[in-house]
Amino acid sequence: GQTVEVAVGGAAPPTAVIVAMEQMGFRVTHLYGLTESYGPATYCAPQPGWANLGLEDKALEMARQGVRYPTLFDQAVLNPETMTPVPADGETIGELMLRGNTVMRGYLKNPDATDEAFSGGWFHTGDLGVVHGDGYVEIKDRSKDIILSGGENISSLEVEEALYRHPKVMEAAVVAKLDDKWGETPCAFVTLTPDAENVSAEDIIQWCRDNLAHFKAPREVVFGPLPKTSTGKIQKFILREQAKELPKNS
């Protein structure tokens, strides 16, 4: 059959979504950008060696944000405290920063926000990520979405990735929920597939415990539709407010 080239963006595509699209005949290219960067800032340029990988491993490569888009002057993952590049080890987290003529000049009539955004001469995206050995960037989370639990940083995207691999999960989003003992713990909001029957919160939590370090598994699961923007992006700020209304873990 014919292969259809598709660009995806708005939010990082879970590997399960990429696998499903590839199986349907779509060749996926992942684009990343912000309003402030006037569209794509990075793209996950496919590499010839990926063709030899299994579909799951290939999807893991394709889900990364990738390399600098040709119209962008420069990108880097920097330590925001020292403004020095993080090592390309796939583990050390820094903030993705951009600069170039396609990046905005500033926020209208808001010089304080502009100065903060361009501290150190780079535009601070607010996205935390790593650089892999091949130079490809992978975003781990928005800085405001990182869950601080018992002194450990938990990436909400990593937990969501595990949830999307569950065969009965159609959509998922994870936010922090206050916890008397740990400070914060992951709270998962999940939309099940139409054919899902008798899937409980305990089933979802156990799935995560089987696929993640135990401390990263959600302690609470809320089922139902997820709030979205007109373009289909999940509105996590609404979910954070909903999580605040839930009884606090103790």
Where on the chain are the PLM-derived regions?
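Conserved AMP-binding/adenylate-forming
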Residues: 4-9, 13-31, 35-136, 143-146, ...
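Hydrophobic/anchoring residues in structured secondary elements
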Residues: 8, 174, 220-223, 239
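Residue-level recognition of the N-termini of beta-strands and the immediately preceding loop/turn
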Residues: 1-5, 218-220
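AMP-binding/adenylate-forming catalytic core of the ANL superfamily
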Residues: 100, 105-106, 128-215, 227, ...
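Acidic/polar alpha-helix N-cap and adjacent early helical turns
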Residues: 242-250
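Conserved Rossmann-like nucleotide-binding pocket used by diverse enzymes
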Residues: 7, 124, 155, 222, ...
